[in-house]
Amino acid sequence: MKFNIDHYIASVLQWILNIALIILSIVLSIFLINETITFIQYIFSTKEYTSYKLVESIIVYFLYFEFIALIIKYFKSNYHFPLRYFIYIGITALIRLIIVSHEEPMETLLYAGAILILVIALYISNMRDLRKE
């Protein structure tokens, strides 16, 4: 009887997680559309925007895109989040942080070091996947 209860609890929690991820993907899609509109407004606006605003908008767009791709990959790979997608998101988020907040040189250097560590982790992760094949 215990096995059936464990299986039932796992199934219910899996359904709750799936529904939450579907809702999250809808919200992220709305934000992605909003960011697309903002990006188009930056391009065709007569106002002068700094290049930082435009680049920040592009990177935020890619963050939304990567999160949506992560959710899609979750459903396609039998309810599993691949590690490399989280690393991609981390690298993109740190690049955005460097672009937006680059006043303090030491912080920028630390962010760049964190990006280097993430790239090394991505390389190690990809090498492990290649060895499995």
From Swiss-Prot:
Q: Which residues cross the membrane?
A: 13-33, 55-75, 81-101, 105-125
Give GO cellular component annotations, separated by semicolons.
plasma membrane
Kindly give the InterPro entries that the UniProt entry links to this protein.
P_starv_induced_PsiE, P_starv_induced_PsiE-like
Q: Name one GO biological process term.
A: cellular response to phosphate starvation
Q: How does it sit in the membrane?
A: Multi-pass membrane protein
Any Pfam family matching the protein: PsiE
By sequence similarity, the record places it as follows: Belongs to the PsiE family.
Protein name stated in the entry: Protein PsiE homolog
